[in-house]
Each structure stands twice: as structure tokens, then as C-alpha cells.
Amino acid sequence: MTENIKKIIEEKLTIIKLPNKKKLIEEEIIEGISYKDGHIQISLFANKDNIEEIEFVGKLIKKELQNIEGVISVTTVLTNEPNKRETNDRTEDKKQKIQQINNVKKIIAIASGKGGVGKSTISINLASAFSLIGKNVGILDADIHGPSIPHMLGLKGKPEVNSDKKIIPFEFNSMKVMSIGFLLNDEQPVVWRGPMVHSAIKQMATETDWGELDILIIDMPPGTGDAQITVSQHLPLDGTIIVSTPQPVALNDAVKAIGMFRKVDIPIIGIIENMSYLLLEDGKKEDIFGKDGAKNMSEKEKILFIEEIPLDKEIRESSDRGVPYIFEKKDGLTKDIFLKAAKKINKII
């Protein structure tokens, strides 16, 4: 960062005042400033209680800095540095405590070891299938860094809080829905470390007014990181469903996910193989990503093979329109498979 640009940015930031009339520069919100080739990035400290305030601050910063000569773009990112702040107030109890969610009978995590296997698609359509067989269903989007559930359900806006200070979830066809995506702008990146991810997931799970639910589906992010540890150690999971494609590269990561859940004593309900085959117009199946990969792996790992979901263009199109395929399609092979999977899982849990 050139010294001249740095000085101009700092001077501009000293001008900004918050709604409480205090100067932004005095509130210890700014974590870092970077500038390169006309692009400014401001890192802002965020916690679970000030997300909306920080979002507003980001808008003020962009408005103030975007007119600086030579500046092409201004980006604000949310970050969290637990070692720098509130260390005396953040001494955590080492004992892992399960947070009960009132009035929710069963909680199922939909997980995968690898991204891009269609886990969120499976989550919304499986939840929809449960709804169609008469269950009261909720969906919690636990993918903090890449929430896609709001888009796939066509939901926008910010959630409100009721008189009990509980978050009022959004609804789609009577399904209750909560996601970090409702709290941030679409273009707002989230740069959070473990403690912040942990806090956000727990808050959404336990401080949302879910009402009476038969099943809460938790759409997990890919991998075996902070979000998975938080959900498995702090929420009363009844089991997890692993999603994978038939490809060896996806199956290898699925095995890692299975191993993680077993280590924390979470039952594996079974595995769903997504994009199993492409159904051609003449009725033939084309095994684009291989054949029977998840089925063979389920036998090796001694877990239930739930169903295989075909690669169906209509599923993708429905998600892009913001309507689950299960609700939009009146009948068809893929819909029958999802309903069959829901009934099979319902018997197990």
C-alpha cells in the first residue's frame, strides 16, 4: 500500500460516525486495511451480536472510500480475532455441553466430505419429501461460508425477533428455514474463524423459534472442520446422512466424514449417492461418474445404502428457480426416489 493512499484512506475513515455518534476509528471495529492495484479491502471485526451493525458500517465505508482517485473497488470482509479481544470474557468451559432444541423431535445432519456433490440439493428435496409424507420439517443451513439454502428456496430478507427474543425463521411451504445468508448481503464475504463459526451455528440452532418440528434437517458445509465439530458435539443429533457421487475422489472424502462422525459417536443413518447416472431419453442409464461407488463403499463401511439419485436437469432448474424439485414436480422417477428415501429414513429414526 502506498503511503499516500494509506494516509487518504485513514483520513476518510476518521470522518465516519456510527449511529451512536461515536467515531468508527475509536470503536476498534477495523481489523485491517489493504490496498493493491486500485482495490481496497477493509477487514471488520464481527461477533454474533453485531452483524447488522457491521453490515451498516461496511456500507458507510464503501460510500466514503469509493470516490478516492485511483480506487477501483472497495470490499469489506467480516473477520474474528478471538485472541485479540475479550479474552477474559471468552474462557470456555472445556466440557462439551449438548444444547437442547425445544420441541424438535429428531435432528439429522446432511453431510459430505467433499464440496460439489449436491448436498444442499439433497437437503432441501429430502426435507420437502418429509413434508409431503406429513412431517413438520425445519431446515438449518450450517454452511456459514457458503450458504445456498436461501437462494435455492427463493427466500430473501432479514429475520425478525419475537417477544421471547427468539429468531423467527422464514417459511417455505410450511417448512421452517434459517440460514446465515439471511443476515448478510449476497456479496458479503464471511471470514470467520472457529469460535465465530461455532457461535453462529449454536445461535441459529438454539435461538430460533422452530415451533413443533418432527424433523430438523441441518445442511452441513463440506469437510470435517469447525462447523462439523460444533454440530456433532453441541447439538443433539439423532444421526447423519452422508452424500457422495460415485467418483472415487468424492468417496474418499466421504469415508473421512464417516470416520469423523464415528469418532464423536454420531450414528450414521446411511449414504445417498447423488448424480448416480444420467437417464437418457430412450430410458437407458449413462454412468457418467462411475457405477455403484457409494453402494460398494456402504458395504465396506457397513452402513445403509439409502438411495441413488440420478443426474436430473430438472432438479438443477428447480433449484435455480427457488423451488424444490419435490414440490414443483407432480410425479416422476426422481420424485419417487426422494419420497422412498424419506420413508426409509423415517422408519430408522
Where in the sequence are the language-model features?
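Phosphate-binding loop that captures ATP/GTP phosphates
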Residues: F130-W192, H198, A205
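Extreme N-terminal, non-catalytic leader segments
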Residues: E26-I29, K36, A46-N50, I54-A111
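N-proximal, solvent-exposed amphipathic alpha-helical segments enriched in charged/polar residues
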Residues: M1-E31
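Residue-level signature of catalytic and energy-coupling elements of molecular machines
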Residues: L13, I30, L65, V104, ...
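Phosphate-binding/switch loop-helix module in NTP-utilizing enzymes
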Residues: L184-V231
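C-terminal boundary of histidine-terminating zinc-finger modules
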Residues: R321-G332
